[in-house]
UniProtKB/Swiss-Prot annotation:
It comes from Hemigrapsus sanguineus. Residues 79-90, 152-170, 247-281, 339-377 are cytoplasmic. InterPro entries: GPCR_opsins, GPCR_Rhodpsn, GPCR_Rhodpsn_7TM, Opsin, Opsin_lateye, Retinal_BS. Expressed in all of the seven retinular cells (R1-R7) forming the main rhabdom in each ommatidium. Its main location: membrane. It is found in: Membrane. This is Compound eye opsin BCRH1.
Length: 377
């Protein structure tokens, strides 16, 4: 094993080589002997990265961890406390929060520990495989849960009362199916189809997407199709048709209002336009965030298998992985906490949270009482 004491001491400015490391040293030279067998030949072609990257990534992951714990923990807590939130649709939201929270608690602490311990994998090879499998399980579960959430919203908005109703039994089945799919596609590397290896700057573990044999290629193509392309297609299909259905509905409403009352048309147009813009923006944000976070990592995987892998540097692999895991931070805010019912639950159960959402039932009662008072007078 290469001597890592010298470079670590020298990085503060010997100036003998880039970042103070001896010439010819690679990023793989810092890996302990017990996990050397998990380093792919690809990583021996790259010099060590600036050590400050390890500390920067550690700080970023700590920041994301705090946000993820707060957001996903809040969603689960509110669901357990508020009876009004215990609906079949919200079961999918809670399943998403649960998978994101498990990703956080199983992947973030070891990664941060490695980052602040010199940027090396500090655990055993077996734990590297477990770490990668847990990240794969929770990541795939989140992707498929998002797919099911988008399809449920499509069914509600586009089919309305004519579509099949989401029951508690169906929601339970869908949540279970997401976990079965994720576990089913994450276990094969333990049995010889595909493998888990050290990745990027070698302080985390993931799929092997560089070895170009039939075993690795077929496994990675399958997970790309079933764990990225298919759910991505459903998500895009759902939100495209949601936006189309909303615009078609509002156009029909405007036409009807125009026939009935020209005065109401003006007031309805302003409100309708705001609603259209708000829903279109929400759909665009949902789809855009999903693709922004997951597409770079999927692209790196395919390039590593089928394209020019020389351009895939340690940092170029690490940053897309960070982007993909950041989903666990924004998901609870986009899909739950921004919803009026969740905000109302925060107001009721956590009044110190500085969220003041009005109960629509109270508003209706006040309006009704005001109307009755005016009629009596």
């Amino acid at each position: 094993m290469a001597n890592v004491t010298g470079p670590q001491m020298a990085f503060y400015g010997s100036g003998a080589a880039t970042f103070g490391y001896p010439e010819g040293m690679t990023v793989a030279d810092f890996v302990p002997d017990r996990v050397k067998h998990m380093v792919l030949d690809h990583w021996y072609n790259y010099p060590p990265v600036n050590p400050m990257w390890h500390y920067l990534l550690g700080v970023v992951y700590l920041f994301l961890g705090v946000i993820s714990i707060a957001g996903n923990g809040l969603v689960i807590y509110l669901y357990m406390k508020s009876q009004a939130l215990k609906t079949p649709a919200n079961m999918l939201i809670v399943n998403l929060a649960l998978s994101d929270l498990i990703m956080l608690t199983t992947n973030f602490p070891p990664f941060c520990y490695n980052c602040f311990s010199g940027g090396r994998w500090m655990f055993s090879g077996t734990y590297c495989e477990i770490y990668a499998a847990l990240g794969a399980i929770t990541g795939v579960c989140s992707i498929w849960t998002l797919c099911m959430i988008s399809f449920d919203r499509y069914n509600i908005i586009c089919n309305g009362f004519n579509g099949p109703k989401l029951t508690q039994g169906k929601a339970t089945f869908m949540c279970g199916l997401a976990w079965v799919i994720s576990v089913g596609w994450s276990l094969p590397p333990f049995f010889g189809w595909g493998s888990y290896t050290l990745e990027g700057i070698l302080d985390s573990c993931s799929y092997d997407y560089f070895t170009r044999d039939m075993n690795t290629i077929t496994y990675n193509i399958c997970i790309f199709i079933f764990d990225f392309f298919l759910p991505a297609s459903v998500i895009v299909f759902s939100y495209v048709f949601i936006v189309k259905a909303i615009f078609a509905h509002e156009a029909a409403m405007r036409a009807q209002a125009k026939k009935m009352n020209v005065t109401n048309l003006r007031s309805n147009e302003a409100e309708t336009q705001r609603a259209e813009i708000r829903i279109a923006k929400t759909a665009l944000v949902n789809v855009s965030l999903w693709f922004i976070c997951w597409t770079p990592y999927a692209a790196i995987t395919i390039q590593g298998l089928l394209g020019n892998a020389e351009g895939i540097t340690p940092l170029l692999t690490t940053l897309p992985a960070l982007l993909a895991k950041s989903c666990s931070c924004y998901n609870p805010f986009v899909y739950a906490i921004s919803h009026p019912k969740f905000r109302l639950a925060i107001t009721q159960h956590l009044p110190w949270f500085c969220v003041h959402e009005k109960d629509p039932n109270d508003v209706e009662e006040n309006q009704s009482s005001n109307t009755q008072t005016q009629e009596k007078s």
